[in-house]
Amino acid sequence: LRKRIRLHQVRVGMFVEELEGTALDPAKPHGRFLIKSSLDLDRMMASHAISVVIDTQKGIDTDTAFPPEGLNPAAFQAHLHSFFSGEQIALAQRAIEETRPYVRNVLVQAQLHHAFQFDSACLAVEKVMSDAMSTTSALIGVAKLKDKDEGTFLHSLAVSALMITFGRNLGLNEEKIRLLGLGGLVHDLGKMVLPVELLRKPGKLTADELALVRTHPQRGYEMLKKEPYVSNAVLEICLSHHEKFDGSGYPHGLAGNDIPLVARIAAICDVYEALTTVRPYKRAWTQAEAIDTMIHSTGHFDPDLLKAFVSRMVISGTIH
């Protein structure tokens, strides 16, 4: 059975019948073939095909774990168990519980005293970095299930884990990966000094409310820079993770490579995690929907980094 899919939906185990919208190149895959490895996936991404025709009788189909009517917590739990063993999920849940006191201390101290607990943040990041890759991948999935009281904690932890995992897949050294994890953990620290009712407002924000929310990168940056041990990379993530590649972001309207690399990485991980969050009161987006939206958000993300995220994190099956 032939089926047309988007390039980012391709997985190892699929049988490709045809690449559409790309010139044939001997150095790139074309014709009919089975995708056997991550190297094949990288070559597929390099083809820049508009769409891919697969044969679902000769290879695997696209993910159909989610019902078309949307994602709810029960459906997502079943989805997790289709990718991770009960032991991996239990290890991920334990990792979340072990980091909870450290991350909560960071958030509470920021909220009550406008201060950054550097030691607590470092302990949380070390815990995530010490876990096996499979546990970290499961943690990213488990952390998508959020209620209103756990949202900030789990989002901060999940973005940190995403940035650590992406950094490893980009081949960065351990110190740079550690800084990515720390930056991911505190990227929204400035929100802790904003009114809670504003952050939880269900409807559309007024212009004044939106302007206030958009002060959180600068507020977080001011809080972090009081701590002498915080590196420039962490400060850059906090201050610039809402900048957009075309210059339309905030707070400073930076564009292209003027946006620090670490902040461009953070922008991708932050948006992906937010889009795929599963809440009891809100339909979450599937991974395919989130990636499709991000790919078509022209000007928002560094296109090369986004391509790497899709290839090395999504298509490779590192995250689900």
Model-derived regions, located:
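Membrane-cytosol interface segments
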Residues: 1-116
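Alpha-helical hydrophobic/aromatic positions enriched in membrane-embedded helices and signal peptides
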Residues: 29, 179-180, 262, 294
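Helix-turn-helix-type domain boundary/helix-start signal
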Residues: 33-34, 170, 203, 228, ...
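Divalent-cation-assisted or electrostatically stabilized phosphate/pyrophosphate-binding catalytic cores
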Residues: 44, 201-223, 244-320
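Acidic/His-rich, divalent-metal-binding segments that scaffold phosphate/diphosphate chemistry
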Residues: 76-214, 221-233
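Short acidic/histidine-centered micro-motifs embedded in hydrophobic/aromatic stretches
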Residues: 124, 145, 180-183, 216, ...
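A glycine-rich, aromatic-flanked flexible loop/lid motif
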Residues: 183-194, 233-242, 261-265, 281-283
